[in-house]
Curated annotation (Swiss-Prot):
It comes from Nocardioides sp. (strain ATCC BAA-499 / JS614). The lineage of its organism: Bacteria, Bacillati, Actinomycetota, Actinomycetes, Propionibacteriales. This is Chaperonin GroEL 2. ATP binds at T29, L30, G31, P32, D86, G87, T88, T89, T90, G413, N477, A478, A479, D493. CDD domains: GroEL. Belongs to the chaperonin (HSP60) family. It catalyses: ATP + H2O + a folded polypeptide = ADP + phosphate + an unfolded polypeptide. One of its GO terms (molecular function) is ATP-dependent protein folding chaperone. InterPro entries: Chaperonin_Cpn60_CS (IPR018370), Cpn60/GroEL (IPR001844), Cpn60/GroEL/TCP-1 (IPR002423), GroEL-like_apical_dom_sf (IPR027409), GROEL-like_equatorial_sf (IPR027413), TCP-1-like_intermed_sf (IPR027410). Together with its co-chaperonin GroES, plays an essential role in assisting protein folding. The GroEL-GroES system forms a nano-cage that allows encapsulation of the non-native substrate proteins and provides a physical environment optimized to promote and accelerate protein folding. Its EC number is 5.6.1.7. It is found in: Cytoplasm. One of its GO terms (biological process) is protein refolding. Its main location: cytoplasm. The keyword Chaperone applies.
């Protein structure tokens, strides 16, 4: 395929145009007075959202260079969302500000590599300052406050805080669609572990890249499954029952995997294969935990159970299983409550006997998975569009609350970045282009606060200057237009969100500034339309 190549300033400006188009669409959503963006869908009703990553995903540009620029910024939003569950719009605004200021300096003759080193040094200093400013999240009210800001809804914040209170900080919280209106919190027995589907062909929800099995059987095998011959008798029995199947094994490959994938694609039989978590003895113990939770047995030749002679009565069951590429959540296993309690007591006894900190930590993890349970937040809304948008917002808020517990909280509303940069830059000692690179970061750290002020109908530059002179932790409450103690007023952000947004934005900005050439696919011309008359003669015109 022929390629288009652009060099130097032309290349950088092409990327910048794409970035600006995407960032301008995303940044209008920032802050309590942020606007919404309507996204047209090929099928179904349009979606109305103020979530940065959802908007970024939908933007596809025609110009090849602009398209690459937009894709790079999408990466910032996606990475920040993956790590922290929020901060996508902040990351996009920071990236735009850094690139815009950086390209001005490159055009004026600054050395891009010197700028890059300066940006990296400044970001490290500001990140360190943010973490030192962070306050630990200790109370249920603080968790509720953080989640409320992310979801822009105090009821959601309170329900998430309640859920975290019930299942613990390490517990699992999932969000499900409900047929009834409003929000409900349910606590169910369940477990999550860090292994996802073996093949993406098992996905049942392509938009979220998830596999969801309702009321499945669970095959737990402490062995590798390669031959379809071993699996076939059991598959036939499960198919007759009409239920889907989750296969947990050391590995599933070869013709066994091919058979499962082909049947899933054809719609003949719904199943998913997942590698067993852990290694060695720890894997055996975790498989046994899952077996007790689901009311099944571990199929292992060590205990005289062979796969080819396994019947349905040896399989576990659950109300629901959700599998992503990285993790599996089993909700409401059909195990016997007394057996689960016995297993929990056994693990507690092992923790007391253990001398090794590492073993104790791993046993604590198993205990949390088995005893903690799963909190399910059920979401209902008047319309399908509202339901999807609300569910997405609540999922973001859950991740946000967990991020707050992990690294603490800082003043929200863009204030922490401005004040952390102020404190960090007093200690930085850089010269030449590196000092210019650091100034680019200083300029960019004002951008989120300025944008929040602009969206609230205020003058961004004036607000940023005023906040810089206030006591640390004080800033603008954009909802009321007053200057307040941000943390006391419940306007807070998880330190992890702010830090991730800054680091990811700086990473992409450095790439933009050091780009000297862009190679893009040449757009193909549309083929000419054929003669609609089919070339037949003798027709009257």
């Amino acid at each position: 395929m022929p390629k288009l190549i652009a060099f130097n300033e032309e290349a950088r400006r092409g990327l910048e145009r794409g970035m600006n188009t995407l960032a301008d669409a995303v940044k209008v959503t920032l802050g309590p007075k942020g606007r919404n963006v309507v996204l047209e869908k090929k099928w179904g009703a349009p979606t109305i959202t103020n979530d940065g990553v959802s908007i970024a995903k939908e933007i596809e540009l025609e110009d090849p260079y602009e398209k690459i620029g937009a894709e790079l910024v999408k990466e910032v939003a996606k990475k920040t969302d993956d790590v922290a569950g929020d901060g996508t719009t902040t990351a996009t605004v920071l990236a735009q500000a850094m690139v815009r200021e950086g390209l001005r300096n490159v055009a004026a003759g600054a050395n891009p590599m010197g700028l890059k080193r300066g940006i990296e040094a400044a970001v490290e200093a500001v990140s360190g300052q943010l973490l030192s400013m962070a306050k630990d999240v200790e109370t249920k009210e603080q968790i509720a406050s953080t989640a409320s800001i992310s979801a822009a809804d105090t009821t959601v914040g309170e329900i998430i805080a309640e859920a975290m209170d019930k299942v613990g900080k390490e517990g699992v919280i999932t969000v499900e669609e409900s047929n009834t209106f409003g929000l409900d919190l349910e606590l169910t027995e369940g477990m999550r572990f860090d292994k996802g589907y073996i093949s993406a062909y098992f996905v049942t929800d392509p938009e979220r890249m998830e596999t969801v099995l309702e009321d499945p059987y669970v095959l737990i095998a402490n062995q590798k499954i390669s031959s379809v011959k071993d699996l076939l008798p059991l598959l036939e029995k499960v198919m007759q029952s009409g239920k889907p199947l989750l296969i947990l094994a050391e590995d599933v490959d070869g013709e066994a995997l091919s058979t499962l994938v082909v049947n899933k694609i054809r719609g003949t039989f719904k199943s998913v294969a997942v590698k067993a978590p852990g290694f060695g003895d720890r894997r055996k113990a975790m498989l046994q935990d899952i077996a007790i939770l689901t009311g099944g047995q571990v199929i292992s030749e060590e205990v005289g159970l062979k796969l080819e002679s396994t019947g349905i009565e040896l399989l576990g069951q659950a109300r629901k299983v959700v599998i992503t590429k990285d993790e599996t959540t089993i909700v409401e296993g059909a195990g016997d409550a007394d057996q689960i309690a016995g297993r929990v007591n056994q693990i507690r006894a092992e923790i007391e006997k253990s001398d090794s900190d590492y073993d104790r930590e791993k046993l604590q993890e198993r205990l949390a998975k088995l005893a903690g349970g799963v909190a399910v937040i059920k979401v209902g809304a008047a319309t399908e569009v509202e339901l999807k948008e609300r569910k997405h917002r609540i999922e973001d808020a859950v991740r946000n609350a967990k991020a707050a517990v992990e690294e603490g909280i800082v003043a929200g509303g863009g204030v922490a970045l401005v004040q952390a940069a102020n404190a960090a830059f007093d200690k930085l000692d850089l010269t030449g282009d590196e000092a210019v690179g650091a100034q680019i970061v200083r300029f960019a750290t004002d951008a989120p606060l300025k944008q929040i002020a602009i969206n609230a109908g205020l003058e961004g530059g004036v607000v940023a200057e005023k906040v810089r002179g206030l006591t640390a932790g004080h800033g603008l409450n954009a909802a009321t237009g007053e200057y307040v103690d941000m943390i006391a007023s419940g306007i807070i952000d998880p330190a992890k969100v702010t830090r991730s947004a800054l680091q990811n934005a700086a990473s992409i900005a450095a790439l933009f500034l050091t780009t000297e050439a862009v190679v893009a696919d040449k757009p193909e011309k549309a083929a000419p339309m054929g003669d609609p008359s089919g070339g037949m003669g003798g027709m009257d015109f």
